[in-house]
Regions:
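Pyridoxal 5′-phosphate
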Residues: 138-139
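RNase III-family endoribonuclease catalytic core
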Residues: 2-119, 124, 129
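Short acidic capping loops at alpha-helix termini that bridge into adjacent secondary structure
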Residues: 132-135
Length: 140
């Protein structure tokens, strides 16, 4: 990658909470399953954090968004693990010889409280993105 070609992407995602808890689809954020008896309505596992990270990377690459690459109209992505989608996006980035330096994520939600899960979520993100934990920031 040309050192003068730094790119910045912005990602955003939102899913509504399901009116009923779906045990087969527990709330998953940043690759961490939360034990809060909540579910999100989504075609995939609904991990809004990983979806936003995918969108940020795709945006930096000029490759559209997650819906373009993994459409919710395609049955093969039904229930897809967002970590798998992220790995495909990271492979696209690597093929272009780009790399991540850091991620800074803001979650806007009143529930669930994320502070008890924050350390595990940062660790999961760092592992998925192959970044040191010090380069992963999560605010809620």
């Amino acid at each position: 990658m040309d050192p003068n070609s730094m790119r910045i992407g912005h990602g955003y995602d939102v899913h509504r909470f399901d009116v009923e808890y779906v045990a087969a689809k527990p709330l998953t954020l940043a690759g961490v399953v939360l034990e809060d008896k909540m579910s999100l309505v989504a075609h995939s596992d609904g991990d809004v954090i990983l979806h936003a990270v995918c969108d940020a990377i795709l945006g930096a690459l000029g490759e559209g968004d997650i819906g373009l690459h993994f459409p919710d109209t395609d049955p093969k992505f039904a229930g897809a693990a967002s970590g798998d989608l992220l790995q495909e996006v990271l492979a696209m980035m690597g093929a272009r010889k780009h790399y991540l330096v850091n991620v800074d994520i803001t979650v806007i939600a009143q529930v669930p409280k994320l502070t008890p899960h924050r350390i595990n979520m940062i660790s999961s993100l760092a592992n998925l993105l192959e970044l040191p934990e010090q380069r992963v920031n999560l605010k809620a």
